């Protein structure tokens, strides 16, 4: 039967990509349906109970700047917060939070259930309705047909999911959930390139069976950071510690002796696993010279004894898992609550997508999250928001949007995926961004919130807070610029004594703040009139101290932008462009890049080839002008 309501956008899947996609589309005012196989698992953290980290927190802050839910849910569910790389420059500093699984999931569900324009329905999706290369809706497992011209697939690890524990395996989307077999079969019928990837998770431990007295305590930071630009530490629940222990020679012996029982090393698993989150058996094999590896025991929540032993993800048989766990100091008597496992699943080559995350072959069909070959909640959430927003824009008859590489880590993520593709689960790092001094986590709102407001993603509450912050920065910079300190005055002498910086003549406070040895807090302690908003103070200090470096990056971006944004016609015949080698012609013809900048990042496409493309575009434009004048 047909569902009586027609929708503008349908989102399949209620994980981190799906929830952000559905919320984004609904915030933009279009009628949105979120279809999930189980309402109770909306926003579930399937693997580690943490949000953020190097590169990842930048994505979370960008999601937040565009009105997304992940950061605010983290503030409501976060039970430990830390700033990573706190002694390094602001470009690579990152916020990381341990989250209570129950509180985080509850915060996401509350947001979903209170979002106007959003309907939630519990049914698995088994089929797509496609007519003349255009999606028209979906069909559920009980034959119910939902109609919409825009569908966002956020299927996670469920497509053809196969769970491995030792040499045994069974079908599953994750532990305790069924896989999506019918939809996987349907998608394989489409003219899209498909592959298999693998990820894994460690056994969960009962904290009552662990001896913490022989481990190293890792408390959170004080003062406690927040994840959202709208967040406050008053939102945080009780804060707890993590604990650090290590594997040892005995652990490594157990693993080495049982590699023949590993599905990874016996050839049972076809999919490639995440390079930057390897299983413990992979670590032992690849880094045989290392005597030990860190294991972080992370609490799963405030109302459970379960611990997540970060660092020992494994798919070895259960008896071996038990030996591994009990060989580690402090866990000699540990009880495993849930075994670790690996899961294989289908993903689709992201080079078959546009920047909007719409597939090139089926109009209105968008992919986001692990279906595109990424790993991580944050990467999924970022793609989900972008896909949901673009599905909404398409339903409104508007142009799609994707931030550039110099505007957001979301732009870096999407450009990497659709230009280069991926052979292994893709994880975000700050090192992937060329302009990371500009793409800091602290200024994500200044980069993106105005655009989010224009798109309809940002509500009045967030916009008011953003405007107050932006105006506060301008006011404080102006105040510092117009406040002067002279030598041989009480303030001048205090500055010289505190910072070891004698004043030789009159300086304004902004000049003084640009010096590396002078910090904002110390300066205003002497001169008075500190701002109340710590985000304003942080921005003023970073912008002042790094002004020269930031200006140089902006100049470089301006030089490159003209060619970067040059559009390539959809009907361009690369095979007919003389001067291009056959290899480059074939690469361009297969990739069909949307811009000159994207073409320049295709492996094997040389700067000389880009110059030839530019000449061809100019000739083509001139020829069309002559035709029109004739």
From Swiss-Prot:
SMART domains cross-referenced by the UniProt entry: GIDA_assoc_3
Span of the signal peptide: none
Pfam (any one): GIDA
Gene3D superfamilies linked: FAD/NAD(P)-binding domain (3.50.50.60), GidA associated domain, C-terminal subdomain (1.10.150.570), tRNA uridine 5-carboxymethylaminomethyl modification enzyme MnmG/GidA (1.10.10.1800)
A GO cellular-component term linked to this record: cytosol
Primary location: cytoplasm
GO MF annotations in UniProt: flavin adenine dinucleotide binding
UniProt keyword list: Cytoplasm, FAD, Flavoprotein, NAD, tRNA processing
List of residues binding FAD: 13-18
GO biological process, one term: tRNA methylation
Source organism superkingdom: Bacteria
Cofactor: FAD
Subunit and partners: Homodimer. Heterotetramer of two MnmE and two MnmG subunits.
Task of the protein: NAD-binding protein involved in the addition of a carboxymethylaminomethyl (cmnm) group at the wobble position (U34) of certain tRNAs, forming tRNA-cmnm(5)s(2)U34.
Family named by the database record: Belongs to the MnmG family.
Name of the molecule in the record: tRNA uridine 5-carboxymethylaminomethyl modification enzyme MnmG
């Amino acid at each position: 039967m047909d569902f009586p309501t027609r929708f503008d956008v349908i989102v399949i899947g209620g994980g981190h990509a799906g929830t952000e996609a559905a919320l984004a589309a609904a915030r933009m005012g279009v009628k949105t349906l979120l279809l999930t196989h189980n309402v109770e698992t909306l926003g579930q953290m399937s693997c580690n109970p943490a949000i953020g980290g190097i590169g990842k927190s930048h994505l979370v802050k960008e999601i937040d700047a565009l009105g997304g839910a992940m950061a605010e849910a983290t503030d409501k569910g976060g039970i430990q917060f830390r700033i990573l790389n706190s002694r390094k420059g602001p470009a690579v500093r990152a916020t990381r939070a341990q989250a209570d699984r129950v509180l985080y999931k509850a915060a996401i569900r509350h947001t979903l259930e209170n979002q106007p324009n959003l309907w939630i329905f519990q049914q698995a999706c088994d089929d797509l309705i496609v007519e003349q290369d255009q999606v028209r809706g979906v069909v559920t497992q009980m034959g119910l047909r939902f109609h919409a011209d825009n569908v966002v697939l956020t299927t996670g690890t469920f497509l053809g999911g196969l769970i491995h524990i030792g040499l045994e395996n069974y079908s599953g989307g994750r532990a305790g959930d069924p896989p999506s077999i019918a939809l996987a079969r349907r998608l394989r019928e489409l003219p899209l390139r498909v592959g298999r990837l693998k990820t894994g998770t460690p056994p969960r431990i009962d904290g009552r069976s662990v001896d913490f007295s022989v481990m190293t305590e890792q408390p959170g930071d004080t003062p406690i950071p927040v994840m959202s630009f709208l967040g406050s530490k008053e939102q945080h629940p009780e804060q707890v510690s993590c604990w650090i222990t290590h594997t040892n020679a005995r652990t490594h012996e157990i693993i080495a002796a049982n590699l023949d029982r590993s599905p990874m090393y016996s050839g049972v698993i076809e999919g490639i696993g995440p390079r930057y989150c390897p299983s413990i058996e992979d670590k032992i094999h690849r880094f045989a010279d290392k005597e030990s590896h860190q294991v972080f025991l992370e609490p799963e929540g405030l109302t459970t004894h379960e611990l997540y032993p970060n660092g020992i993800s494994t798919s070895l048989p259960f008896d071996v898992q038990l030996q591994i766990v009990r060989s580690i100091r402090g866990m000699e008597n540990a009880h495993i609550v849930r075994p670790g496992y690996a899961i294989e699943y289908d993903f689709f080559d992201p080079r078959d997508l546009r920047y909007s995350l719409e597939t090139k072959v089926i109009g209105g069909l968008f992919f986001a999250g692990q279906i595109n070959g990424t790993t991580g909640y944050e990467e999924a959430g970022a793609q989900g928001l972008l896909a949901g927003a673009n599905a909404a824009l398409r339903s409104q008859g508007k142009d799609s949007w994707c931030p550039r590489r110099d505007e957001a880590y979301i732009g870096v993520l999407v450009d990497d995926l659709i230009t280069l593709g991926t052979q292994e689960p893709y994880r975000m790092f700050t090192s992937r961004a060329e302009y990371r001094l500009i793409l800091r986590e602290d200024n994500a709102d200044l980069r993106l919130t105005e655009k989010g407001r224009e798109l309809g993603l940002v509500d009045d509450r967030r916009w008011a807070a953003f405007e107050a912050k932006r105006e506060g920065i301008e006011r404080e910079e102006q105040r510092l610029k117009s406040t002067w300190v002279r030598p041989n005055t009480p303030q001048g002498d205090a500055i010289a004594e505190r910072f070891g910086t004698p004043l030789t003549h009159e300086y304004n406070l902004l000049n003084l703040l640009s010096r590396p040895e002078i910090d904002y807090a110390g300066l205003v302690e002497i001169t008075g009139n500190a701002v109340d908003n710590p985000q304003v103070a942080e921005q003023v200090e970073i912008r002042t101290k790094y002004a020269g470096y930031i200006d140089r990056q902006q100049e470089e971006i301006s030089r490159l932008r003209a060619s970067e944004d040059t559009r390539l016609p959809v009907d361009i015949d690369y095979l007919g462009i003389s001067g291009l080698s056959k290899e480059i012609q074939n690469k361009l013809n297969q990739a069909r890049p949307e811009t000159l900048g994207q073409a320049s990042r295709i492996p094997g496409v040389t700067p000389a080839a880009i110059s030839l493309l530019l000449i061809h575009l100019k000739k083509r434009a001139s020829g069309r002008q002559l035709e029109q004048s004739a």
